[in-house]
Regions:
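Short, Lys/Arg-enriched N-terminal segments with co-localized hydrophobic residues
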Residues: 3-23
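Sec-dependent signal peptide recognition
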Residues: 25-30
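C-terminal motif of bacterial Sec signal peptides marking the signal peptidase cleavage site
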Residues: 37-39
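N-terminal propeptides
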Residues: 43-47, 85, 101-106, 113-116, ...
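Alpha-helical segment of the N-proximal tetratricopeptide repeat
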Residues: 46-83, 97, 134-135
Length: 394
């Protein structure tokens, strides 16, 4: 305290220091004391009121998606210790998830500056930049710089290897991501479980072979929307090219669900102005994806496995010119799925996809999970299954 007081003496006017007015002196010293105390760390109020404890609580909140609660915990950690580097990186991470880009960058820079020799802090800093990938063009460069530094501090540092894999995954270098996740799984440490899940995802995407930039982006989605599927069908399956190669349908051909292969000339009322408008209109034109009776497409709704199966069925019916495909499996006894009766509206589509190896039931339970979501990677694998079924190469 004395040191800090002495350090600011040169900036105090001499007239104030020599002032004989005791009231003025008292006011001056009181103000200085308050100022100095405000810059100091707060005192803990219990044995568990420590920076480390609050940091761990903050990280648990982050993993649970409770980012405002995380901010509170991380802030307390640095209030208790102004030099606590992990706390600042934690603040950066929570702000990044909340979209507070300026605060996220400020805190992560402060954290890695204070913890430049700690590989755990550097890895956490890299995680912040990965989270900011939608807001910062140089996110990969910044993240990899911190991870390289961490790995120099500690060779084969587990967290750094894991987040290098995550960085490559979101940079769409899936082969490189696989390599890092494989290393982490082999270490059988704290990150092994997470790495195994990401490794499986990377392997699945590699098998799906997304051939377009949009395919690579959607491949990472945990749930895809109807708009996402429209884009995938247009770009990865190349529906327009597929239909152009097909011979014209017979004049009287109709599927039970669609009037013709040409579909409706009227675009959905909710596609106009949507980011996927062009692709949505293309898919509804060919009746591959349906429009509801109120003429809406509902592009931002998450698509279910049953809905995806129905879309695949429509495509196969038109491609094969066999309307019987839409009713072939209805009423089967017993049902081939343990969770879906053969009277289900989408049962035929699900059975058709399973029969042709395009979509699969769970190998253990036999469940098809019709209301479950479709991941981006699974959506791409299904498209490859469609191509295989149609024996087409693009």
């Amino acid at each position: 305290m004395v040191f800090y007081f002495q350090s600011i003496l040169p900036y105090i006017p001499a007239s104030l220091l020599t002032n004989k007015d005791s009231a003025m002196k008292h006011f001056l010293y009181s103000a200085l004391a308050i100022f100095l105390l405000a810059g100091c760390s707060q005192k803990p109020q219990s044995d568990v009121d420590t920076p480390e404890y609050h940091f761990k609580a903050g990280m648990r909140a982050v993993e649970s998606g409770e980012y405002n609660a995380a901010l509170t915990s991380f802030q307390r950690s640095v209030d208790l210790d102004k030099k606590f580097a992990p706390g600042y990186c934690g603040l950066g991470l929570a702000h990044a998830h909340l979209g507070n880009v300026k605060e996220a960058k400020k805190n992560v820079d402060k954290g890695v500056s204070k913890g430049s020799k700690d590989p755990d802090v550097l890895a956490l800093g890299a995680r912040v930049w990965i989270t900011l990938r939608e807001h910062e063009k140089k996110w990969f460069k910044r993240a990899s710089k911190l991870l390289d530094k961490a790995l120099k501090r500690k060779e084969n540092h587990e967290a750094s290897l894991y987040y290098y894999g995550v960085a490559y995954l979101y940079n769409y270098d899936f082969d490189e991501a696989e390599s890092y996740f494989r290393k982490v799984v082999g270490k059988k440490g704290t990150y092994a479980g997470k790495a195994d899940a990401k490794w499986n995802l990377a392997q699945k995407i590699v098998r799906a072979m997304p051939g377009t930039p949009v395919g690579k982006k959607v491949a990472l989605h945990e749930k895809i929307t109807r708009a996402d599927l429209a884009v995938l069908f247009a770009e990865e399956l190349k529906i327009s090219e597929l239909f152009a190669r097909m011979p014209q349908q017979n004049a009287g051909f109709q599927t039970p669900g669609q009037a013709s292969a040409g579909g409706s000339a009227v675009n959905p009322v909710d596609s106009k102005g949507h980011w996927a408008e062009t692709w949505i209109n293309e898919m509804t034109k060919y009746s591959v994806l349906d429009v509801s009776p109120d003429r809406k497409f509902y592009p931002d709704e998450v698509i279910s496995r049953a809905e995806y199966a129905m879309a695949v069925q429509r495509l196969l019916v038109v491609a094969t010119k066999d309307p019987g495909l839409e009713i072939r499996y209805f009423g089967e006894s017993p049902s081939r799925f343990s969770d879906v009766p053969s009277s289900h509206y989408a049962y035929n589509a699900m059975a058709l996809c399973a029969e042709r190896g395009i979509m699969h039931a769970d190998m253990i339970t036999g469940n098809f999970s019709p209301s479950g979501p479709v991941t981006g990677a699974d959506a791409l694998l299904i498209i490859r299954g469609i191509q295989s079924s149609l024996r087409m190469t693009f």
